[in-house]
Structure formats: structure tokens, C-alpha cells
Design a protein with these regions (language model features):
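Extended, low-hydrophobicity, polar/charged segments
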Residues: 6, 10-196
Length: 196
């Protein structure tokens, strides 16, 4: 069981475009993460994904959780934010679900890329109630970290490099992870052109 290595100080980690937010190590603040997110992040760290230890979390007012509002309020760069969109389609009566991660400056190409990946005729956004119930996360806080293993996890190649501000599973906080962490999530598929 290896020693966890954390940055000496948070000033060692520079996140371009973070604005006035001051996050802290996520593994030291598990109360700010939804249970499935805690499990997934801890598992990554135990697996030796070094960058999992660099994941950061910051508490925010739930009223400011929406990307556009948060970006304005904290003077953040919109390109730092990545959204997790849940999409579903059916094939031979079987529902197929994908969690799609794209930069906030783009939209998930549901009608072409996602549909093809899921191998379904028609793909559409998952209803809010189902998304919340199945993920164990709060609406507005749904994140790729800790989604059910039966779902496809599609990550736009633009999110596989640099930092992303993503949900924590809760509306009252945000998670900051590197592209390496997203790529190391179980079942993660890096997809060119997912975000358009």
C-alpha cells in the first residue's frame, strides 16, 4: 500500500482559467463528494493513478452551480468547464446508456457520434429523474467520476488533456480533475469529435 503523495501546497498546482475559486485536495474533503464519486476517486488513487491525488474540490453555493452562472460569478474561463450529459437509446429492447463528457464550449454530437457508438437508431437525452436515480448523484452535479459500470463512458478528446471543472455528484461543490484522471476512469473511451 503506497504512500499518498499530495502537493506540498495548493500553490504547487496551477489551473489555468480557475478565476477566484480556491479548491482543496478532494481526497481530504470527501464530504464534498457524492458517495459514488468518493468510491471511484478513492479506487483510482488506490490503483496508483497518481493524478487522482491531485483532484481538487471546492464548495460553492448550489444557486451558482450552473456552468454559465459559475463562470461569470468566479471569473472562470468557460473552456475549463466540462459537462457530463447522459444519453440513452434502445437496441432490440435493451436500453443503452452513455455518459458523455464534452467541454462546456461545445455540445455532444448525439445524433451522429453517440448514436453510432451506442449502435442505436435513435438516441436522446435521459430524463432528469432517471438520471438522478440511476447515478446516485444530484441533478446539476452529475459527473463522469463514479457512473455505473454498465454505462458507456465517452470522453471527448478535448477533455483528455488539461484540467476540467466537472460535477462532484452534489450541487454544492465542483471537482477539478486532469485529462489523465478522466482517461483512467473504468471503461473510459476517448472519442474524437464527440463535442461539436
Amino acid at each position: 500500500h503506497g504512500e499518498q503523495t499530495y502537493p506540498e501546497t495548493m500553490s504547487d498546482i496551477i489551473i489555468p482559467g480557475i478565476g477566484s475559486l480556491e479548491p482543496a485536495p478532494a481526497l481530504d474533503h470527501l464530504d464534498l463528494l457524492a458517495p459514488p464519486v468518493t468510491v471511484a476517486l478513492t479506487a483510482l488513487a488506490e490503483r496508483g493513478v497518481a493524478t487522482a491525488s491531485s483532484a481538487l474540490v471546492v464548495a460553492i453555493d448550489p444557486e451558482l452551480a450552473d456552468t454559465e452562472v459559475m463562470t461569470r460569478e468566479f471569473d472562470m474561463d468557460l473552456t475549463l468547464s466540462s459537462n457530463c450529459i447522459l444519453v440513452a437509446g434502445k437496441r432490440a429492447g435493451e436500453e443503452r446508456i452513455a455518459a458523455c463528457v464534452v467541454r462546456a464550449t461545445t455540445n455532444a454530437d448525439v445524433n451522429h457520434v453517440v448514436k453510432k457508438r451506442l449502435d442505436v437508431r435513435k438516441a436522446s437525452f435521459w430524463p432528469q429523474e432517471r438520471a438522478v436515480e440511476a447515478s446516485g448523484m444530484e441533478y446539476g452535479g452529475i459527473t463522469p467520476v463514479g457512473v455505473p459500470g454498465s454505462w458507456r463512458l465517452l470522453i471527448d478528446s478535448a477533455c483528455s488533456v488539461g484540467w476540467s471543472c466537472i460535477g462532484s455528484g452534489l450541487r454544492r461543490s465542483k471537482l477539478f480533475v486532469t485529462g489523465e484522471v478522466l482517461a483512467a476512469l473504468p471503461g473510459a473511451e476517448i472519442v474524437e469529435g464527440l463535442g461539436v
